[in-house]
């Protein structure tokens, strides 16, 4: 797995961010799948004010047109005004979404029109709070974050 970090202050310890990515994704993905994953983590001030969220995970535009059926390139945006612990909790949440995309549980299509599916079921029109992929990410974020920091890293 390759992780690049952009616009994230050093106080968040870039090495620790990379370790967290590996820790979380190694719980869900095989070593073979993990070695192909590329994640760009982009810090953004005021993300909450601009977009109404503390973090986002998306399949990189590099994936589309690559001919690959399973996405392996991801972008995670995180609000850098967060405190240390919350940033890692949000990172864990977004990494659950990476797992969902990489395992093809969560899929988005843009042609002929936008559709979002979860395990084969169309969830395009569901409210954010009723989305099963968000329920899973919220259920796992704190547990993963606590497990990561219990390792004493």
Mark where each language-model region is.
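Hydrophobic or amphipathic, alpha-helical segments that drive membrane association/targeting
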Residues: 1-13, 37, 42-49
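Hydrophobic beta-strand residues in large extracellular and virion-surface proteins
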Residues: 3, 21, 37-41, 74-78, ...
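Generic detection of long, well-ordered alpha-helical segments
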Residues: 10-18, 127-130, 134
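Zn2+-dependent metallopeptidase catalytic core
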Residues: 13-36
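Short acidic alpha-helical/loop segments enriched in Asp/Glu that coordinate divalent cations
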Residues: 33-39, 108-109
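Active-site scaffold of zinc-dependent metalloenzymes
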Residues: 49-85, 98-102
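Metalloprotease/metallohydrolase-associated module, dominated by Zn2+-dependent proteases
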Residues: 81, 85, 105-153
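Short alpha-helical catalytic segment bearing the HExxH-like zincin motif
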Residues: 86-94
């Amino acid at each position: 797995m390759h992780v690049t970090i952009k616009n994230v202050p050093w106080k968040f310890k870039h090495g620790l961010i990379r370790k967290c990515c590996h820790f979380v994704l190694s719980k869900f993905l095989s070593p073979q799948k993990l070695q192909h994953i590329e994640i760009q983590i982009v810090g953004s001030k005021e993300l909450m004010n601009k977009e109404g969220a503390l973090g986002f995970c998306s399949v990189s535009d590099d994936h589309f047109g690559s001919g690959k059926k399973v996405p392996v390139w991801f972008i995670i945006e995180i609000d850098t005004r967060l405190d240390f612990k919350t940033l890692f909790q949000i990172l864990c949440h977004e990494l659950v979404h990476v797992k969902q995309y990489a395992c093809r549980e969560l899929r988005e299509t843009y042609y002929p029109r936008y559709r979002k599916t979860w395990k084969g079921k169309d969830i395009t029109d569901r409210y954010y709070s009723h989305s099963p992929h968000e329920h899973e990410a919220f259920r796992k974020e704190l547990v993963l974050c606590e497990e990561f920091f219990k390792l004493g890293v």
